[in-house]
Amino acid sequence: MVAEKETLSLNKCPDKMPKRTKLLAQQPLPVHQPHSLVSEGFTVKAMMKNSVVRGPPAAGAFKERPTKPTAFRKFYERGDFPIALEHDSKGNKIAWKVEIEKLDYHHYLPLFFDGLCEMTFPYEFFARQGIHDMLEHGGNKILPVLPQLIIPIKNALNLRNRQVICVTLKVLQHLVVSAEMVGKALVPYYRQILPVLNIFKNMNGSYSLPRLECSGAIMARCNLDHLGSSDPPTSASQVAEIIVNSGDGIDYSQQKRENIGDLIQETLEAFERYGGENAFINIKYVVPTYESCLLN
């Protein structure tokens, strides 16, 4: 009877009835994630379940190399070069204290080529302008010195600096037309000079080049657009500007922007024209994508 009275009282007062608890959705138990272990490829750790294999490092083919002190700078600071900076109404140029034809090319020309690695004023200006002056007046003295120029040229190209590469290519274009047989004498050294050109051959970026002074006779034989009437020297750090996917026909003030891919193509064509019958096959061996400008 007492139980019946309690049920009747609960029915009359539903608020007093005990509330049912709602069942929540069952949550999945947390799963412990193992700590990932970074490992090198082809090692014992790489076979573990929680290992993450690190990818291969970048090859760095286009990465610039650090510069080293050059012999040209040491000789210039010591005052061993018979040159001085001359100022006139047109700009700055080299004033030679002796006749260029009387210089010892075996001593001076390799030193000036060593200065191709320089990128600061006045070293870069004296080195590049001095090279073109000596090539213009060298004549028969250039060919015997050619083996001594290969290592400085190779060192300049191996810096992978776009500005230095462009200027070195212009120097090579001038070198092959500076005297007879120089182009043919360069053929055995293609394997030392051309590998870097093969890397940058398809690069399409424009770089500013300082204009230098060169005679019209030399300009008529090779594409040296950056050579002109004496202009103020400009250091590489001041003129280095990249314009991707733009041509080389833009001329701002006295600085000529050159496309590095086009410069390499022009240089290889100059090598083939002046290198004789064996030039093309040796170029093709190092630069497989090069197509002959004479056979086609």
From Swiss-Prot:
Annotated Gene Ontology MF terms? actin binding; alpha-tubulin binding; beta-tubulin binding; G protein-coupled receptor binding; heat shock protein binding; Hsp70 protein binding; Hsp90 protein binding; protein-folding chaperone binding
Subcellular localization(s) per the UniProt record: Cytoplasm, Cytoskeleton, Cilium axoneme; Cytoplasm, Cytoskeleton, Flagellum axoneme
Entry keyword annotation includes Flavoprotein: no
- Supply the InterPro entries for this chain: Parkin_co-regulated_protein
Q: Could you tell me which Pfam families the record lists for this protein?
A: ParcG
Give GO terms for biological process.
cellular response to unfolded protein; flagellated sperm motility; protein localization; spermatid development
The UniProt record lists the keyword Cell membrane: no
Q: Which domain of life is it from?
A: Eukaryota
Signal sequence, renumbered to the chain: none
GO cellular component terms, A-Z: axonemal B tubule inner sheath; axonemal microtubule; cell body; cytosol; glial cell projection; manchette; neuron projection; nucleus
Tissue pattern of expression reads:
Expressed in all immune tissues, spleen, lymph nodes, thymus, tonsils, leukocyte and bone marrow. Expressed also in heart, brain, skeletal muscle, kidney, lung and pancreas. Expressed in primary Schwann cells and very weakly by monocyte-derived macrophages the primary host cells of Mycobacterium leprae, the causative agent of leprosy. Component of Lewy bodies, intraneuronal inclusions found in the brain of Parkinson disease patients.
An additional note in the Swiss-Prot or TrEMBL entry is: Linked to PRKN in a head-to-head arrangement on opposite DNA strands and share a common 5'-flanking promoter region.
The record's function comment reads: Microtubule inner protein (MIP) part of the dynein-decorated doublet microtubules (DMTs) in cilia axoneme, which is required for motile cilia beating. Suppresses cell death induced by accumulation of unfolded Pael receptor (Pael-R, a substrate of Parkin). Facilitates the formation of inclusions consisting of Pael-R, molecular chaperones, protein degradation molecules and itself when proteasome is inhibited. May play an important role in the formation of Lewy bodies and protection of dopaminergic neurons against Parkinson disease.
Query: Self-association or partners: how does it assemble?
Result: Microtubule inner protein component of sperm flagellar doublet microtubules. Forms a large molecular chaperone complex containing heat shock proteins 70 and 90 and chaperonin components. Interacts with STIP1, PRKN, GPR37, HSPA8, TCP1/CCT1, CCT2, CCT3, CCT4, CCT5, CCT6A, CCT7 and CCT8. Interacts with MEIG1.
Q: This chain belongs to which protein, by name?
A: Parkin coregulated gene protein
Q: Which organism is it from?
A: Homo sapiens (Human)
Chain's gene name: PACRG
